[in-house]
């Protein structure tokens, strides 16, 4: 059965994911190291993991596989889940796939190196999360859930 895993730290689409999971009657695991208000939805499990680097990511990576969908912005976690056969989405609806995950990891590493080489440079962060990002995410989540359900059957 398909499970929707949400890497919940700084996830702007948790509520949207819950609505979609409920509509599809999917189990949803919202994984964090704390600070989340548990959902009253019986399909949603709030998983609180111990503090520590990448503990939530490890929890998800150990469980996600073929027929599941993972929502995360964490590229190393996405790589592990893609390798395990799960379908993986960013919060803006962009899919991590076997075809693009290597490039995503390389770009992440390059950007980390550039930031480390220029400690005085302006970081700035990413662009704000928009209504278009939210709509793109919802469309992509619907598509990936249907595909994951097919994966789980075959």
Curated annotation (Swiss-Prot):
Coiled-coil annotation: which residues?
A: none
Q: Which InterPro entries does the record associate with it?
A: UPF0178 (IPR003791)
Similarity comment: Belongs to the UPF0178 family.
PANTHER family documented for this protein: UPF0178 PROTEIN YAII
- The molecule here is called UPF0178 protein SPO3827
Organism (species): Ruegeria pomeroyi (strain ATCC 700808 / DSM 15171 / DSS-3)
């Amino acid at each position: 059965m398909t499970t929707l895993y949400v890497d919940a730290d700084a996830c702007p689409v948790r509520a949207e994911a819950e609505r979609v999971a409920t509509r599809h009657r999917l189990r949803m695991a919202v994984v964090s190291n704390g600070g989340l208000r548990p959902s009253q939805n019986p399909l949603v499990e709030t998983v609180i993991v111990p503090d520590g680097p990448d503990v939530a990511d490890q929890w998800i990576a150990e469980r996600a596989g073929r027929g599941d969908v993972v929502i995360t912005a964490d590229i190393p976690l996405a790589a592990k889940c893609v390798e395990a056969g799960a379908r993986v989405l960013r919060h803006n609806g962009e899919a991590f796939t076997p075809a693009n995950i290597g490039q995503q990891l390389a770009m992440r590493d390059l950007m980390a190196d550039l930031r480390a080489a220029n400690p005085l440079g302006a970081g700035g962060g990413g662009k704000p999360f928009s209504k278009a990002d939210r709509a793109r995410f919802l469309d992509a989540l619907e598509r990936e859930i249907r595909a994951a359900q097919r994966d789980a059957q075959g």
